[in-house]
């Protein structure tokens, strides 16, 4: 049996950060990852001489990525990743909050009948951005390079106070963004342009604050995967261990042991599960727990396993043997583009439900006709 003071399960960004933080402090830590490499949704891959981003296309600093790189001394160069919003033949390169007036002008040009509603939406975006600045606009002092307790304490206290005050306000804005947009505008096309690239029922505080995040995007030189490789390499350099292609099938909390698919056992002092939550509950063995704890686990397990993802992401990777100049004319390196100002309307809601309700009788032509309209009016 392998014994470790700390075991982190899941080699995504959360697991890597947790394991590196522990290794940085000299702790005996093992990171277990079921795939052949770490990263999860943060990965890069090569195909025919082109590098593609397999998951997230860039990083959002959010006051964390930059300080993390400095804290752990990662040998990684991070580049600005400006965002372009494109609608039909119009494009706007976002330069943070100061681009809001230009964004309002763009929307009013597209929807002249809804100028007052555009103003209301921009006002709501400004209000949420002000609340979110403490989370995304300031470096977290806990990642300060030199942690002198006396000098760090005032900034931590001030940041913590702002953080909890902001979280309180955010809790009041936890409703789906669709409801908030409905209250601000009756123009479905306008609402679609602002919100249709978010997952259904995304909290309004996140959706409306996203404009501020556009200026916070960064791109690691060498790809998003280079950031992951840097984190993983630093873990092992600092004495931590990583086991790849290791899938856990049993979690025995009463005995603090894990068992993988090959039968290998691991004993831990502390466990951090940064992997799939459903996998944790499927693997959880409650037999050694008190009766009350078993009942609570069973209730929680049923609730977790009954949930499904809101939507899926379909990615198309295109390799173009062209110089950068034509792409520079069209926009920056990261673009949100909507071909038609009309937006999706009911295509992805009522029409999709109607299609699914008679799925057994839907013809191939009907399906492809719906897909063509879905792609024509969507945001990419």
Mark where each language-model region is.
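Generic recognition of stable, solvent-exposed alpha-helical segments in well-folded globular domains
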Residues: 17, 64, 102, 120, ...
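Active-site/ligand-binding neighborhood in enzyme catalytic cores
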Residues: 126-238, 245
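N-terminal glycine-rich phosphate/pyrophosphate-binding loop and immediately adjacent elements
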Residues: 2-137
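Short, surface-exposed acidic
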Residues: 76-79, 110-122, 185-194, 292-295, ...
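Short loop/edge segments at beta-strand edges and connector loops
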Residues: 10, 80, 228, 244-246
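A short catalytic or substrate-binding loop motif that flags glycine-/basic-rich loops and adjacent residues
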Residues: 77, 198-201, 308-312
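Mid-domain catalytic core of redox enzymes
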Residues: 220, 249-380
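A structural preference for short, hydrophobic beta-strand core positions in alpha/beta folds
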Residues: 31, 242-244
């Amino acid at each position: 049996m392998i014994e470790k003071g700390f075991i982190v399960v899941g080699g995504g960004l959360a697991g890597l950060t947790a394991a590196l933080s522990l290794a940085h402090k000299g702790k005996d830590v093992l990171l277990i990852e079921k795939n052949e490499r770490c990263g999860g949704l943060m990965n890069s891959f090569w195909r025919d001489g082109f590098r593609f981003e397999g998951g997230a296309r860039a990083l959002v600093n959010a006051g964390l990525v930059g300080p993390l790189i400095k804290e752990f001394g990662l040998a990684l160069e991070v580049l600005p990743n400006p965002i372009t919003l494109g609608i039909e033949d119009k494009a706007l390169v976002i330069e943070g909050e100061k681009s809001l007036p230009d964004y309002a002008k763009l929307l009013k040009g597209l929807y002249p009948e809804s100028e007052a509603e555009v103003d209301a939406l921009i006002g709501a975006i400004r209000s949420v951005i002000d609340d979110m600045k403490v989370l995304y606009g300031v470096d977290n002092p806990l990642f300060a390079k030199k942690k002198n307790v006396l000098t760090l304490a005032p900034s931590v206290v001030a940041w913590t106070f702002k953080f909890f005050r902001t979280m309180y306000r955010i809790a009041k804005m936890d409703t789906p963004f669709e409801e908030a947009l409905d209250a601000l505008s009756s123009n479905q096309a306008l609402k679609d342009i602002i919100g249709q690239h978010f997952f259904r029922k995304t909290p309004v505080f996140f959706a409306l604050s996203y404009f501020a995040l556009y200026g916070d995007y960064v791109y690691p030189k060498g790809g998003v995967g280079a950031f992951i490789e840097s984190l993983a390499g630093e873990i092992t350099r600092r004495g931590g261990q990583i086991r790849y292609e290791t899938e856990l099938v049993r979690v025995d909390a009463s005995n603090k042991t894990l068992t993988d698919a090959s039968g290998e056992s691991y004993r831990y002092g502390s466990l951090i599960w940064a992997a799939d939550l459903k996998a944790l509950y499927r693997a959880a063995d409650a037999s050694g727990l008190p009766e009350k704890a078993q009942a609570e686990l069973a209730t929680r397990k049923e609730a977790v396993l009954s949930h499904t993802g809101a939507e899926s992401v379909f990615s198309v990777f295109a390799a173009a043997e062209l110089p950068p100049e034509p792409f520079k004319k069209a926009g920056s390196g990261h673009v949100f583009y909507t071909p038609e100002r009309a937006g999706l309307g009911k295509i992805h809601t009522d029409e999709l439900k109607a299609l699914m309700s008679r799925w057994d009788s839907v013809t191939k032509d009907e399906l492809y006709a719906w897909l063509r309209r879905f792609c024509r009016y969507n945001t990419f």
